Amino acid sequence: SGKHCIIGFFFVFMQAIYDTGIGYIEDESIVRIDKIQNRRNPQSVIDIANKLRDDKIIQEPSEDLNAPNMQLGSIIQGNVKFVYADNIDNLKNLKAKDIFTDWNFNDGEHTKELWLTHKFNSTKAGFSQLFELYNSDLIFEMIQKIKKKISNGDISPDNKNFEEISEEAAITKGKGILILDIIKGNSKYNNFYETFKSSPWQVIENNYIDSDSLLSYKFNGLKGFYEAGTKRDKILRKLDDVFELFELYKYKKYNAFLRKTKFKISNYADKKRLSDEMNILSNNIDKTIEEVIISANQALRIENDVFFDEFINTQGNYLWERIKKIPFKEYMKSIEYQREYLPFATQHSVKGSEYDNVLVILDNGKWNQYDFRTLFGSGSVNEGVINRSKKLFYVCCTRAMKNLVVFMPTDDPGIIESAIKMFGNENIVNGNDIS
């Protein structure tokens, strides 16, 4: 047609924290337009970020006097600290000290504590049992591995119950330890195993737990509210419905509340009875998930839908037997975590976000895809691990709008010396010496 078309590619090389996608385009025909001015971070964080960058860009404060990182015509200096201690357990004590005087760890909107994985955060946020069930349940792991052995033709499932096929399959974990032995040696797991061991294998094999289901409660930007994602299972959707009723009543949205229940209000006595019922329900969060569902159904005149009943009696049977005994408050904590009401988040999840105060914990646990020691010239020599760790650390640091504290459990003199070069000697804190 003779018309010229300009195609723009927007990306930040240092924020390519996932192995999928394209992190960098190398083509001589592309005109590179670098974003030099930084509108988010204080000077102290910009300085750290520039030391981490390996894309040949050196950022500087914005020239816009109205930029978020400007105050009275000058760049906000901000504060950065590198804190080290012998043990990760020291962190709890450190959070109560002067270094965090102006931080409010109950304010998830302005303060974030960044850990590498949801597993770390589930413990901190108060839903570790739920997270373990959806991500590392031993009985479900054994079921999946037995199915794989059957698929490979290693064993035959014909006319066998769960106990028989579990013993024949001899599934191992770690250093050759039988998963079945681990299950029998754990009273919690063994109780569930005893419940299901006589069931026919063709019934057991249909049980499924989707690890993505628990954390699939997301904000819908178009609708302006949080809702269940497509991977949300029927049990969690039921809990979402109950929790929604709690919130509708709490925030006095009575018309919407009544539309979703069969509770009828004809006089003051009905209104008083509803108030009493809701007070009882709201004080029952320490009860189990099953107890809360039963109480809510009875008090609010609601019923389980056919999809819920079908799910808990078929592929969700084992999941239901497990989850129904977990305290309802763990479910509530998982919702608060996903709504970002709590100060905990994964380092991957905050890309694009910004907070006044950011605490980054450099502990990669047992995830061998990362090694934060490489930031300071130690640890893994794997190039992928080195690049992955650096970019993730860069993303974490550049979330801070005022204060950045990096905590690392280490006593390695080489790491501490390298940290001094990166952060400056005046910004290094020995957490072991803080009393």
Which stretches of residues belong to each language-model region?
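The feature marks helicase ATPase cores and/or their adjacent C-terminal helical subdomains
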Residues: S1-S435
